[in-house]
Amino acid sequence: MITSLTGTILQRRPPWLWLDVQGVGYELEMPLSGFYQMPAEGAALTVHTHLTIREDAHLLYGFMTVAERDMFRLLIRVNGIGGKVALACLSGLPAERLSQAVAEGNTAQLTAIPGIGPKTAERLVVELRDKMGGIAPGPMGRGGAGDPRQEAIAALLTLGYKPAQASQAIAGLADGLGLEDLIRQSLQNLSRH
């Protein structure tokens, strides 16, 4: 799987981004919010990715942060939510507010997103409330690393742990650890309990 790409921006045509990575051009579909954060054409950029392989297409989605990509992966697990609707969700609300709306059961805020009706909003709340309640994406930079603790929490949530479990597992660890060490040690702590 392609987890990230670093290259030069060839074209920005929302929702499409063309990225040149050592002579190979990649076409990525991104949430509209990502285009506000990225530099101009010709600049270097790192994009976190999700690859979907279907019978009729290979689709590469791009995200400015790991937490945003993890949010996308949670969204597409919900029955009736595909890549387009998940991108619409992330375009309509920042990942942190989307997570908060789901955790609070705020279906009115969710139905304000194009493509999300009342039934879909309810389904999002029911299926994701326990998984999304603690996602807090790191700073929305230019694809750089966010807070390793927040990214580790997002990784644990993606693995199916509840927000309280993930936060508690990370809270007890020493400061200054890298992302991989945080995840490894928190998984060891969680397996003991």
Curated annotation (Swiss-Prot):
Residue ranges of region Domain III? 144-193
Record-linked Pfam families: HHH_5 (PF14520), RuvA_C (PF07499), RuvA_N (PF01330)
Annotated spans, Domain II: 65-139
Instruction: Provide the GO biological process annotations.
Output: DNA recombination; DNA repair
Keyword set for this entry? Cytoplasm, DNA damage, DNA recombination, DNA repair, DNA-binding
Query: Which is a Gene Ontology cellular component entry for this protein?
Result: Holliday junction helicase complex
Please give the Gene Ontology molecular function terms for this protein.
ATP binding; four-way junction DNA binding; four-way junction helicase activity
**Disulphide linkage map:** none
UniProt-annotated stretches for the region Flexible linker: 139-143
What ranges does the record give for the region Domain I, renumbered to this chain? 1-64
Q: Where in the cell is it found?
A: Cytoplasm
Q: Which InterPro entries match?
A: DNA_helicase_Holl-junc_RuvA_I, Hlx-hairpin-Hlx_DNA-bd_motif, NA-bd_OB-fold, RuvA, RuvA_2-like, RuvA_C, RuvA_C_sf
What is said about its interaction partners and assembly? Homotetramer. Forms an RuvA(8)-RuvB(12)-Holliday junction (HJ) complex. HJ DNA is sandwiched between 2 RuvA tetramers; dsDNA enters through RuvA and exits via RuvB. An RuvB hexamer assembles on each DNA strand where it exits the tetramer. Each RuvB hexamer is contacted by two RuvA subunits (via domain III) on 2 adjacent RuvB subunits; this complex drives branch migration. In the full resolvosome a probable DNA-RuvA(4)-RuvB(12)-RuvC(2) complex forms which resolves the HJ.
Q: Which family does it belong to?
A: Belongs to the RuvA family.
Function statement: The RuvA-RuvB-RuvC complex processes Holliday junction (HJ) DNA during genetic recombination and DNA repair, while the RuvA-RuvB complex plays an important role in the rescue of blocked DNA replication forks via replication fork reversal (RFR). RuvA specifically binds to HJ cruciform DNA, conferring on it an open structure. The RuvB hexamer acts as an ATP-dependent pump, pulling dsDNA into and through the RuvAB complex. HJ branch migration allows RuvC to scan DNA until it finds its consensus sequence, where it cleaves and resolves the cruciform DNA.
Per the record, what about its domains?
A: Has three domains with a flexible linker between the domains II and III and assumes an 'L' shape. Domain III is highly mobile and contacts RuvB.
This chain's protein is named Holliday junction branch migration complex subunit RuvA
Organism field: Acidithiobacillus ferrooxidans (strain ATCC 23270 / DSM 14882 / CIP 104768 / NCIMB 8455) (Ferrobacillus ferrooxidans (strain ATCC 23270))
